[in-house]
Amino acid sequence: MNSKLNSAMYSAHMIMRHAFGYNDYNNKYGRINDVYNKMADGKRLRLEEREVKSLRGLVCTLKMMIKNTDIITYDEECCICMAKNNRKEALPCQHNVCRDCYYKPMRNNCPVCNMEWPMRKDDKHAAPYGLAEYAHTYGGEEQRTPSPPVLGTVEGGDISPRLVGAIRTNDTWLSSRRDSPYHIENRIHNNNNNNYDENNPDDLPVIHPPRRRHRQTAHISI
């Protein structure tokens, strides 16, 4: 008896929550909850006339809602984790997101269509989304930080700003002597002799950017 009532109460809760809005259904749901508490004791109900009328009206409303409700099937994949057979959250954009992903730290927007989810913003059970989750959607202990560009000059001219912006290196490769003239000359010497160690980042060959060729124009006087 109690299991059937719990299932019925949950269904009524979800239907009323989506039909009346996420902030206006509390009073209506409270009426059904009062009747549920009395039915859970297994005794014959003793209701006032106003409670009976209110309950009948809500039952009729729920029946109308059920007729206009689309049945959600759990065979569809979650658009975040691609898992099936999980209970999905009802979203205004009609995309499928499982509850595990829905309550994790993420933006209040659909990852597929970028539609806003105002109800998630007001949900106290949803984890907030902050700067820590900006680069990594679900956060975690390890946060990725962008590596700094390689600065300095090499033989043959300065590195162009565009090339500097494109060169990225790991933090473990950086050292105080990486861009020193002696270190660069040593790497050039190893490169010419083909005796550098591929497993040692400091011995990797130095790549010289091509020199910029200036266009030569000839002025012909007539």
From Swiss-Prot:
Protein's name in the database: Putative RING finger protein ORF118
Region (Disordered): 184-222
GO molecular function, one term: zinc ion binding
InterPro entries referenced in this protein's UniProt entry, alphabetically: Znf_RING, Znf_RING/FYVE/PHD, Znf_RING_CS
Disulfide topology: none
Ranges that cross the membrane: none
Entry keyword Zinc: yes
Domain of life of the source: Viruses
Bias type Low complexity, positions: 189-198
Composition-biased stretches (Basic residues): 209-222
Organism encoding this protein: Ostreid herpesvirus 1 (isolate France) (OsHV-1)
Gene3D superfamilies (UniProt xref): Zinc/RING finger domain, C3HC4 (zinc finger)
